[in-house]
């Protein structure tokens, strides 16, 4: 296992130009059929942006032009879904929607035309998200447990429970990152980055990287007293601001990166092994150049969905082309959110 160490005493105010190569903007088309209210998830393919907005899935091309929506598929018909809790992309390009109320997986093509339905047993609940692993396996995610479901056997074949603090959301959908045939897991409130192994109907989380912020700042859930109510732990956070509360971690062939809260500020730790960069940055409220927890990461690019009002605080125009700078002038406050694409060094 690799250990990545960061020195918090050397943390500096956010400076995007030190780790971002370029910034581009995608203005999502705003019309009566594509109006976004509260973006909950983003997925990026080679040709599409797929946005989940309050249970509705909408697709846009790479220019931001609106293509299709599942709005008309919300209902009680045989090919409709009642509650779109989560969605995932299948290898052939179809989109699978998890209806938590009816315990169904419904598959649609890229134009959101109905393909198939799979009925799930109710014992998979409670669930906060899910992930496609293979034609036979789906992974259902709850706040501190994982459930491996076999389609061919129509049942849960294994479970993994993180024996931490029950009030903490250790697992969340954004923490699962697919790279080729491998799946990696970034848990919250922990410094480890895992590879998810599925072998002979068994789940295993294998730690491959540890993020180290120093003995005084590292948070170890094993040290927490058990059996306390949620208020106890919230008060602990308030009383111990100089602990690192990890939100998301990202590891690729060149970089180790982590978003976390420390000393009542949001931080970003960045290491580029090829370039020899190892630095920690923090955001200052109401100042320009802030770097927020991303909605999606792929191939060295962070994607963040920003409301137009906040865009000015999240970009450095010196890293943008003239075309993208001019796009800012076209945006109105009541337009759809903007996807900011941060290409990393």
Regions found by a protein language model. Name each.
Residues 5, 47-53, 93-99, 132, ...:
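Short beta-strand elements that form the blades of beta-propeller/WD-repeat-like
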Residues 8-36:
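A short helix->beta-strand "capping" segment at the edge of beta-propeller domains
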Residues 29-34, 38, 65-92:
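Blade-loop segments of beta-propeller domains
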Residues 32-33, 71-79, 120-127, 162-167, ...:
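Short coil/turn segments at the loop-to-beta-strand junctions that recur within blades
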Residues 37-41, 80-86, 124-133, 167-175, ...:
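Repeated scaffold domains used in trafficking and secretory/extracellular systems
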Residues 82, 99-145, 158-168:
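Asp-box/WD-like beta-propeller blade repeats and closely related beta-sheet repeat scaffolds
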Residues 208-233, 242, 273-299:
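Conserved blade-ending motifs and adjacent loop-strand segments that build the rim/top face
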Residues 300-345:
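Blade-level signature of beta-propeller repeat domains, shared across WD40, Kelch, NHL, RCC1
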């Amino acid at each position: 296992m690799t250990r990545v160490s960061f020195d918090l005493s050397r943390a500096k105010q956010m400076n995007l130009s030190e780790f971002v190569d370029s910034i581009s903007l995608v203005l999502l088309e705003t019309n009566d059929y594509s109006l976004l209210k509260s973006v909950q998830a983003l997925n990026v393919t080679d040709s599409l942006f797929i946005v989940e907005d309050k249970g509705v899935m909408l697709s846009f091309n790479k220019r931001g032009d609106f293509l299709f929506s599942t709005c008309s598929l919300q209902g009680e018909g045989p090919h409709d879904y009642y509650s779109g809790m989560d969605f995932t992309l299948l290898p052939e390009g179809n989109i699978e929607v998890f209806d938590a109320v009816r315990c169904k997986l419904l598959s649609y093509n890229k134009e959101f035309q109905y393909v198939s339905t799979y009925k799930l047993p109710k014992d998979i609940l409670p669930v906060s998200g899910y992930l496609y692993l293979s034609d036979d396996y789906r992974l259902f995610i709850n706040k501190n447990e994982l459930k491996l479901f076999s389609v061919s056997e129509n049942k849960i074949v294994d479970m993994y429970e993180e024996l931490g603090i029950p009030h903490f959301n250790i697992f969340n959908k954004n923490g699962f990152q697919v790279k080729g045939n491998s799946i990696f897991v970034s848990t919250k409130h922990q410094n480890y980055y895992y590879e998810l192994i599925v072998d002979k109907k068994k789940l295993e989380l294998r730690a491959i990287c540890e993020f180290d912020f120093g003995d005084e700042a590292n948070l170890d859930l094993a040290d927490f007293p058990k059996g306390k109510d949620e208020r106890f732990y919230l008060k602990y956070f308030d009383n111990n601001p100089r602990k690192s509360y990890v939100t998301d971690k990202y590891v690729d062939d060149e970089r180790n990166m982590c978003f976390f809260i420390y000393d009542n500020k949001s931080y970003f730790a960045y290491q580029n092994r090829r370039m020899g960069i190892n630095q920690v940055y923090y955001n200052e409220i109401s100042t320009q150049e802030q770097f927020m927890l991303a909605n999606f990461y792929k191939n060295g690019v962070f994607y963040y969905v920003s409301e137009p009002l906040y865009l000015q605080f999240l970009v450095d125009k010196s890293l943008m082309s003239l075309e993208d700078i001019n796009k800012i002038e076209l945006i109105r406050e009541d337009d759809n959110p903007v996807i900011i694409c941060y290409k990393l060094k």
